[in-house]
Structures are given as structure tokens and as C-alpha cells.
Amino acid sequence: MFDVIVVGGGPTGLMLAGELRLHGVRVLVLEKETEPTRQSRAQGLHVRSIEVMAQRGLLERFLERGHTVAVGGFFAGLATSWPERLDTAHSYVLAVPQVITEQLLAEHATALGAEIRRGRALVGLRQDEDGVTVDLADGEQLRARYVVGCDGGRSTVRKLLGVAFPGEPSRVETLLGEMEMTASQEELTSVMTEVRKTQQRFGAMPLGDGVFRVVVPAEGVAEDRTASPTLDEFKQQLRAHAGTDFGVHSPRWLSRFGDATRQAERYRVDRVFLAGDAAHIHPPTGGQGLNLGIQDAFNLGWKLAAEVDGWAPEGLLDTYHAERHPVATEVLDNTRAQIQLMSTEPGPQAVRRLMAELVEFENVNRYLIEKITAISVRYDVGEGHELLGRRMRDLALKHGRLYERMHEGRGLLLDQTGRLSVAGWEDRVDHVVEVSEELDVPAVLLRPDGHVVWAGEDQQELLTRMPAWFGAATAG
């Protein structure tokens, strides 16, 4: 019997598997595809996901396989510069294809002891008071104490649970693919600049070796959304919008996506959870989807591990839905707004022109970037200091950096006074006596995901706060 079965071997499922293995949880990842995807799909990590990788000691591996960029334009393609000041030590976007992200996360999870089985499709699940039985397409049955559905927008887990997935269907569709072209870079740039004055869902990005990532509006919404478009469809739509097909040829892969926006009503049904696209879908505007899923996993992983290990306080697992559902709701809303701003209709275009003026203000630009990159997220962990509920940035300490102390996925008390104690919780909370010129509060208590749940200097207040997030103290 496994502790946790993760259904889906994409970025969300693999991130979750790694988080669980940090705590010794016996985890199995079931992936229906027999081979890892060769499609680049999502193209990068935003600031909060970069911080997540840094907190687990993975960032250097990602930096070696990608490149950093500090450019704006993430909100509806509005031309903006990168803000001068962001509350982060990692003020950039990391351009790295999803295929590399999945590879690195899989290597991390398996190195920690996670088991990944490919070519295994889930067809049924049943819960009881002791665990969950899952049925596979090949007739095999497996048992686990918990199951997490990370199996995408068409999630089998969500459907088997009967969880409602309200929202709006696709009204417009976009073609996306990677291919070669005979047109020169000069011709491409000239035409693209002109077309994008009125059509934001159009572009071609060089990927190297003569390959371009091409995006162009589809003629309509396909009846069969699972069917890949043809190269002829791309050529037809390129000619319709640009007057040329740029001589595209030799496609690596072709796909389509719509602007459907939906969210699961519940992220938890007893022993089964939903994360990533299984819990929410939205257009890829702003590049938030993969990042949102990684952050779901980062929130759920330590909580589920605490439950398996037996020290989770009552109600801890319920905080997953309470914290992550509102975050996704905001993301869905901002993608809806972006889609409106990208419309070619006169009304939305007028609003877009107004927004283009507003983003020239530094505070407006920074607000939008903080929203897209998820560093403005604040969970409701109770009243008190302004830091409560916020993630702590990667502070420079007298010796090293804060995130270097969080690689093991434990809680952390950063104590600048040297007078506090975590006695009774040493098995799950590290006590770091360090000074940081960037922190203006005597001490902060961080959850394993880096969010602040206490700030101050009073030992009795700390002792009162610890059980709410780290369970009862161990007698000793």
C-alpha cells in the first residue's frame, strides 16, 4: 500500500512527488502516456516558481538549462518594462521549455525515491475510511492512503469524484506549434510588428536551429478539440492574418488551445485531492498555468506529508482548498481580463489603449507583474503582523541566504535575537539564529512552503502559534 498515489506525471504531479519524498512519504506517480512529451508547451517559470526551486535547491539545475530575461509584456501583451523594484531576490523570468521542467522535476523526484510508472491509465477509484482503491485500464488495482489528481484539464480523477467544474467554454481558439520557415528574420519581424498592432494572438518566436514557435488565431472552435491541427490550417490562417505563410514547413508538433475558463468547486473530497489543471483551466495568457500548478503542489505537499507522518494539526489538509482556491479564482479573473484586452473589437481596443497608458506608471506596472508572477499572494493565516500569510523572500543572511536553509522542506524559525526556542518541535522545525539587514522584525516562523505564520519576539506567543501549523509538541 502506498501512502500517496499521484495521478499525472506533468510538472504539478512531479513537483508534488518530490515534496512528498522529502518527508519519506511512499509515493507512486501514474502517468497514462508511455513517453515524456517532446512538446515545449509552457515556456518559463515566473518569480514565485523560481523561488520555489531555490527553496528546494533546484534552481541551479534550471538556470543551466534555460536563460533569464527581465522583460515586461506579460499582461495581455502590453508593452512594458520590467519593474525597477520587486520584493524578490530573483527579479527575472526563467525561460525554460516545459519538457525540460518535467525532466528536471522527474530526476529530482526519482532521486529522492519516488516511483513513476508510465503507460498506466486510471479508470476507477473508490474511497473508504482507510484509503483509496484505484483501478487501472490494464485491470491492476492499487491502494493508497491518499490520491491526488494532477491529470490535467480533462481530469479522470475529477470526473470520477463527480466534482463540478463550472466556468465558460472556449469561444475563440488559437493554433500553436513549432516548425521551420523559409522567410527571413527581417520579413518575419516586419510583418509581425504590423499584425500585432491589432491582433495579439499572433507571433513567431525563434527557438534556435531554424525552428520557430508559431501562434495564430484559428478560424473557429474545432468540434473535436483533441484533434491536432494540420500544417495546411496553419498556412491558411497565417495568410489570412499576415498575407503570407512565411514558407512554414517541417512541423515538430502542432496543437490548439481555447480560452475555456473553469475551476473545480472543491479541491478535496475526503482522501482525494485535485491540483494543477485538474483543479483549474484558463487561457495561457500571462504564462501562469504551469506556475499555478507547481505552487498548488508546493502548498499541498508538506501538508499531506504531515498527515501521513502523524503530526498534522486538525484541519491542516482543509487549508489546501481554503488557500489555493481563491488564488486560482484570481488567476482566472486576470486571464479573462487579458482575453478581453486582446480582442479586436472597438470597445476592448479602447480599453487596451487606456491600459497601455496606465502601465507606464511604475506602481501599476509593478502591481500587474506581482499578480502575474504570484509574489503578491497572501494566505489568510490570522491577524497580526503585515508579513503574516506572505511568502518570505530569499533574504541575505550574515552567513549565506535564507532559501539555502530550506532545502529539506521543514519549517523554519529565523531568530535574530538568539533568545527563542523550538523545543518540542525540533523534528519538524529548524531553528536558525541569524541576522539579516533585510528583515525588520526580531523573528519569523515560516511554514515549509516559506509563508510567514508568526512574527515577533515573545516566546510565549511563539509557543501558542506553533501547534496551529506544526501540531503538538513532542514530549521530551
Swiss-Prot record:
**Keyword NAD attributed:** no
Annotated residues that bind FAD are located at 12, 31-32, 98, 122, 156, 277, 290-291
Named cofactor requirement(s): FAD
Q: What keywords does the record list, in alphabetical order?
A: FAD, Flavoprotein, Monooxygenase, Nucleotide-binding, Oxidoreductase
Top-level taxon of origin:
Bacteria
| Its EC number(s) | 1.14.13.211
A Pfam family this chain is assigned to: FAD_binding_3
Q: Per its UniProt entry, what is the enzyme's top EC class, as one word?
A: oxidoreductase
What this protein catalyses is: rifampicin + NADPH + O2 = rifampicin para-naphthoquinone carboxamide + NADP(+) + H2O + H(+); rifampicin + NADH + O2 = rifampicin para-naphthoquinone carboxamide + NAD(+) + H2O + H(+); rifamycin SV + NADPH + O2 = rifamycin SV para-naphthoquinone carboxamide + NADP(+) + H2O; rifamycin SV + NADH + O2 = rifamycin SV para-naphthoquinone carboxamide + NAD(+) + H2O
What Gene Ontology terms describe what this protein does at the molecular function level?
A: FAD binding; oxidoreductase activity, acting on paired donors, with incorporation or reduction of molecular oxygen, NAD(P)H as one donor, and incorporation of one atom of oxygen
Q: Which residues bind rifampicin?
A: 196, 213
Which PANTHER family does UniProt cross-reference here?
A: BINDING MONOOXYGENASE, PUTATIVE (JCVI)-RELATED (PTHR43004:SF19), TRK SYSTEM POTASSIUM UPTAKE PROTEIN (PTHR43004)
Family named by the database record: Belongs to the rifampicin monooxygenase family.
Its annotated function is as follows: Monooxygenase that can modify rifampicin, thereby inactivating its antibiotic activity. Inactivates a broad range of rifamycin antibiotics.
Q: What is this protein called?
A: Rifampicin monooxygenase
Gene name for this UniProt entry: rox
